[in-house]
Amino acid sequence: MNWQIAIDGPSSSGKSSVAKKIAEELDFFYFSSGKMYRAFAYVMQVNRLNIDLFLKIINQINWRFEKDAVYYNNADITTVITTQSVANIASKIAVDPNIRKIAVIKQQKLAENKNIVMDGRDIGTVVLKNAQLKFFLDAKVEIRAQRRLQDMGISLSNEKKLKELIQELKQRDQIDSSRTADPLKKAQDAIYLDTSELSFDAVVKQTLKEAKKVFKL
């Protein structure tokens, strides 16, 4: 039997960092669904495709999603898909129902026959809805903005940038939670964790405790 852990949450809630650490500790395969949308966006960008054209050729595309890498035509694109230009395209196409439908199928296929930790915004509700363990990580938008600022290497004293990030996150939350296709929401059987006042290590400790209890590790 294969074990599945689904971790969802809004942008900058810490889900990817926590998911990756849990997978490392449990020796599970780790995958962030965001990588797939970014890979889609990259292919569209380099080939100058709109969504309709992309959907016509998507099943002919040669790509591979591995534990820590993404390949397109056997070239490692893991780093290039992290650029802001790719991220901007990814956020736009991620709301398209047809894109999401294909992504879900590919993510479910990726999860077959392995122990996996997957994070995203619809993992526990759609992609791995039968996962044995689900978490929904959340945090106050101000805290998430501060974390994003720190990740960018910008001082927390930069109030102008902080306010901009707060607004960006609020807008992203609205888009994610109100889209018609697979909106961001907590799965009924997910464990809710507000990480606003918790350290990274504390969140990892709590999630690992639950995992070891459920999987009897």
UniProtKB/Swiss-Prot annotation:
GO BP, one annotated term: pyrimidine nucleotide metabolic process
HAMAP family: Cytidyl_kinase_type1
Subcellular location as annotated: Cytoplasm
GO molecular function, one term: (d)CMP kinase activity
Residues that hold ATP according to the record: G9, P10, S11, S12, S13, G14, K15, S16, S17
Protein known as: Cytidylate kinase
Predominant location category: cytoplasm
Catalytic activity entry: CMP + ATP = CDP + ADP; dCMP + ATP = dCDP + ADP
SUPFAM superfamilies from the UniProt entry: P-loop containing nucleoside triphosphate hydrolases
A Pfam family that the UniProt record links to this protein: Cytidylate_kin
Signal peptide positions on this chain: none
Keywords: ATP-binding, Cytoplasm, Kinase, Nucleotide-binding, Transferase
Cellular component aspect of the GO annotation: cytosol
Family (UniProt): Belongs to the cytidylate kinase family. Type 1 subfamily.
